[in-house]
A protein has these predicted regions:
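Short glycine-rich, low-complexity segments
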Residues: 1-89, 94-138
Length: 138
């Protein structure tokens, strides 16, 4: 997949990311015990939890380097490897960079940034999903 620009080759990533985007938009809860990237709900299987984001990381093809992207938050520029998939179009996905929450007392580990990027999924070697969470201002 990494060196093949055939759009049909990225379908496994496209399917997973489309599931994540759909879940983030609807926030439905159901009782299923799968614990994978395409688990059919965000967070726990009770209505007492509320999550709106399934954070993801990307690894490049070949050398499996963790992707990082720049962001600016509160006047400080840094890099993050944690993203929120906002949209999927064919073999491309648009992601928002998530920054570590500066409020160390918060239960929510990430905050939203205004940094967005589009990634060609043919350049991705692996996707890793992090625990579901709530991100404000999404």
């Amino acid at each position: 997949m990494c060196e093949n620009n055939n759009n049909n080759e990225c379908s496994c990533y496209t399917n997973i990311l489309n599931t994540i985007v759909t879940l983030q938009r609807q926030g439905d809860v159901c009782d299923d015990t799968l614990n994978s990237c395409d688990r059919p709900y965000l967070g726990c299987a009770t209505s007492s939890c509320f999550y709106n984001t399934r954070p993801i990381t990307f690894y490049s093809c070949g050398n499996t380097t963790l992707w990082t992207m720049p962001y600016t938050l509160n006047g400080q520029t840094s890099r993050s490897s944690v993203f929120r998939c906002e949209a999927v179009d064919g073999c491309c996905c648009t992601c928002r960079v998530l920054a570590p929450n500066p409020d160390e007392a918060s239960e929510n580990p990430y905050v939203s940034t205004n940094s967005l990027f589009t990634l060609n999924l043919n350049c991705v070697g692996a996707i890793s999903c992090l625990p579901d969470t709530y991100v404000s201002c999404i």
